[in-house]
Amino acid sequence: MRAMSKSLTILGIETSCDETAAAVLRYEDGRATLLSDVIRTQLAEHAPYLGVVPEIAARAHAELADLTVAAAMNASGLSYAELDGVAATAGPGLIGGVLVGLMTGKAIAQAAGKPFIPVNHLEGHALSPRLSEDCPFPYLLLLVSGGHCQFLDVRGLGDYRRLGSTIDDAVGEAFDKVAKLLGLGFPGGPAVEALARNGDPKAHDFPRPLLNRPGLDMSFAGLKTAVARASANAKSEAEKADICASFQAAICDVLAEKARRALEGFDAGAGDKRFVVAGGVASNKAIRAALETAATAQGARLIAPPLRHCTDNAAMIALAGAEHLAAGLCETDGLASSARPRWPLDEASAKADPVFGAGRRGAKA
């Protein structure tokens, strides 16, 4: 498909995990303007189970998808005829939810006679800072979420090279498991972060796995095991706070050191060195502060999306769809695309060097 230079208006749909989201975005001259941005969470549905239940998530998406899209279109003040395309997450993620959003998007595109753009959810996160920041390529990306933790060299749209990944648990997964061990409820990340503010980060000398090993690969399973041992005897809120603070400090140390190494070897070309952090865990203030320090020490600028766009959202999906459509990089027939529970962002290198155990839902990158 050839590139488009005119202003583009795109409907984006996101249903890969436990948020049902829709957004309408206008893209012109490389700049995005959000016309609507609707996110419906499923926290109440999953809280009793202390985690996301795929079947419950899929049913909730099926109930909410049409209503969420209608709300986004109404808020934008536009009709479907005024859209230039429809983008939806086609993976990776929980397959039941991905299917709901994908089929909803295809149906709207078919009925309105508009192009359909299947979007990689991870690419949505990778591009998310461009919703609100001037963030030209290339840049170093740390994608850190419940299912992923990886450093990527982002050279351009569709041009991604993995530099390092977790070899077992993702950071967000580790936060959720620590919260479960301490009985802090769901979602675990915000609960651990909140309690950590009242604790002593030096109370426990938790391991920093792979910290001194060359390269950018990470591991968090051993840290989680150490927390499990410490939490077995933790009864008071003060003891739990110390565990949370010490755990979070270990995470910060690992991410900051790996970021320092990544930035040290990153080729920014003739431009400024930019370090982007994206994904749900990017909303953690302690982690942001540690990464900011690492970036500054390497003469780089840390860029992160607003908190609303760190977690799953449809604005980033609409942006990815718009950028692909504008560049003429869309599939010839997006309606023929399939839902993909696994979809590495750097597909070529992932086939040559797959990462196993990259998150709670298996090796997706």
From Swiss-Prot:
Keywords: Acyltransferase, Cytoplasm, Iron, Metal-binding, Transferase, tRNA processing. This is tRNA N6-adenosine threonylcarbamoyltransferase. Substrate binds at residues 143-147, 176, 189, 284. CDD domains: ASKHA_NBD_TsaD_bac (cd24133). Belongs to the KAE1 / TsaD family. The lineage of its organism: Bacteria, Pseudomonadati, Pseudomonadota, Alphaproteobacteria, Hyphomonadales. Fe cation binds at residues 121, 125, 312. One of its GO terms (molecular function) is N(6)-L-threonylcarbamoyladenine synthase activity. Its cofactor is Fe(2+). Required for the formation of a threonylcarbamoyl group on adenosine at position 37 (t(6)A37) in tRNAs that read codons beginning with adenine. Is involved in the transfer of the threonylcarbamoyl moiety of threonylcarbamoyl-AMP (TC-AMP) to the N6 group of A37, together with TsaE and TsaB. TsaD likely plays a direct catalytic role in this reaction. It comes from Hyphomonas neptunium (strain ATCC 15444). GO terms for cellular component: cytoplasm.
